[in-house]
Amino acid sequence: MVCEKCEKKLGTVITPDTWKDGARNTTESGGRKLNENKALTSKKARFDPYGKNKFSTCRICKSSVHQPGSHYCQGCAYKKGICAMCGKKVLDTKNYKQTSV
């Protein structure tokens, strides 16, 4: 669960955009090369388990968080009804039985 403010902070997917005027993946603007595998060529998007940008641990259950910039794992964020990135209350879970199974 992510709040509206933190949705802007989420990363973009490696797949190209659908074609439209002004898209960032068109060849005319020089933004995207043809026959390029972005998963192999982009060094900053590649996962480095021992590097500086390691994933943090959840503040509640201490498990590893698989989203850069998040402080809570998705299971704990769902159970508590909070944003996974900032911890802001998103959903009132008073009358719910929240399970992550």
From Swiss-Prot:
Subcellular location: Cytoplasm; Synapse; Cell projection, Dendritic spine
GO CC, one annotated term: postsynaptic density, intracellular component
GO MF annotation: an example: microtubule binding
Primary location group: cytoplasm
Disease involvement: Rothmund-Thomson syndrome 3: A form of Rothmund-Thomson syndrome, a disorder characterized by sparse hair, eyebrows and eyelashes, juvenile cataracts, and poikiloderma, a genodermatosis presenting with mottled pigmentation, telangiectasia and epidermal atrophy. Additional features are short stature, dysplastic nails, and skeletal and dental abnormalities. RTS3 is an autosomal recessive form. RTS3 patients also exhibit microcephaly, with moderate to severe neurodevelopmental delay and seizures.
Role played: As a component of the minor spliceosome, involved in the splicing of U12-type introns in pre-mRNAs. Involved in the cytoskeletal anchoring of DLG4 in excitatory synapses.
The protein's name: Cysteine-rich PDZ-binding protein
Organism, scientific name: Homo sapiens (Human)
